Amino acid sequence: MAVGNGVLLHIARSLMLFFHVQKLVQYLWMNSRRHRLPPGPIGWPVLGALPLLGTMPHVALANMAKKYGPVMYLKVGSCGLAVASTPEAAKAFLKTLDMNFSNRPPNAGATHLAYNAQDMVFADYGPRWKLLRKLSNIHILGGKALQGWEEVRKKELGYMLYAMAESGRHGQPVVVSEMLTYAMANMLGQVMLSKRVFGSQGSESNEFKDMVVELMTVAGYFNIGDFIPSIAWMDLQGIQGGMKRLHKKFDALLTRLLEEHTASAHERKGSPDFLDFVVANRDNSEGERLHTVNIKALLLNMFTAGTDTSSSVIEWALAELLKNPIILKRAQEEMDGVIGRDRRFLEADISKLPYLQAICKEAFRKHPSTPLNLPRIASQACEVNGHYIPKGTRLSVNIWAIGRDPSLWENPNEFNPDRFLERKNAKIDPRGNDFELIPFGAGRRICAGTRLGILLVEYILGTLVHSFDWELPSSVIELNMDEPFGLALQKAVPLAAMVTPRLPLHIYCP
């Protein structure tokens, strides 16, 4: 039976009314949710909350969280910023909503330092990132890969022990960060490029250390241009200019290393290193291809994050042990009981030393290498703890605040490894599943070097504590524990200490 025109007109009107009502309901729903943004401070005109962050944003944000709660929303320039300051809030963003927050927002560091986000750290979550991550895990960062270059770590640490023992023999203080950078850069150079980057600890390795520290510092700055893109070209703080100058230095170094690696290819026949492996597998099944710029950017990630983040935690841990000699002595007694004093500390010893592991966890808690996780951005609007988070909102997880939360940690400003020997905290692990302790982040964008970072902290710190007695130079009345803000938390004043060998002298010979 034919349908009359009147019926069709009625259906059309009903459909139009339905769609209009649907749009109205959606509009009202969205607007009602906008009024349910997470609480946060009222910022300045144009700049928003930027001036409120000061020179120590992680501390300022931790103080704001005491007033506004575990999830805050700040208008920073023209951008929205959500800040998570408790384990529960961090878990909501980094686990429950992990996929929605799997990309990085555009920023000057990615553009001017990381080859326009052609690296693994700042790349969007997609085929190129997956390829870089896969290659890194297979050959250098995964569990099986780490076992494969254990001897390299042992050998390079031997060179460092010898240099430190020589400093002690001549009555000279050891500058810890310089020694660590020298050793770690050479470890990575051996496995990535089949060469020691620095022949000896000196001006060249110290210059590299200064470059790494500068990169990790400027990359952590809150750059006005990142939050008010319309004025980014003005570079009001001079940050972008500094990044460009620093990038030229790193690019020259990486270019030289790649050229030397190509020239020595005949020496590695049958023994490919990480770079050979990457070049041989630069194409994947999804049609993604790694170009020279991607390889440079990946090496930059490895050399900077691989040397700085772990070394800063080790330096902080040693500083805390010097301030707490009872803890230092107890750690040495544990090692003497398990290892003795007739051989070096080995990686296999770590699992038998619960107090050392507790010291490392306490260092990760109190001095996380990255106080604010690398920023992420919401791909879609979402809801967290009943609050509306708009699409395009940037996310910052305050790892430092979680580690200093008195509701989680008794006397959080004290360095007390025993807290990780107590029943409720004994099983807490820093690998990203226990949100009370996430020094490397969590979720699919967790630091790719998490396994390596934890291993280096435990192995190198354990070796240094077992191998030497430590004390401050006589000229130091009180140890400076100040921390300037950056992508990684450095000591404002590098730790310099006197060391005395505890083991037979032949053990220190490389």
Curated annotation (Swiss-Prot):
One BP annotation, GO: anthocyanin-containing compound biosynthetic process
EC number of this enzyme: 1.14.14.81
Pathway: Pigment biosynthesis; anthocyanin biosynthesis
A GO term, aspect molecular function: flavonoid 3',5'-hydroxylase activity
InterPro entries named among the record's database cross-references: Cyt_P450 (IPR001128), Cyt_P450_CS (IPR017972), Cyt_P450_E_grp-I (IPR002401), Cyt_P450_sf (IPR036396)
Described function: Catalyzes the 3'5'-hydroxylation of naringenin and eriodictyol to form 5,7,3,'4',5'-pentahydroxyflavanone and 3',5'-hydroxylation of dihydrokaempferol and dihydroquercetin to form dihydromyricetin.
Protein name, UniProt field: Flavonoid 3',5'-hydroxylase
Organism: Eustoma exaltatum subsp. russellianum (Bluebells)
Lineage of the organism: Eukaryota, Viridiplantae, Streptophyta, Embryophyta, Tracheophyta
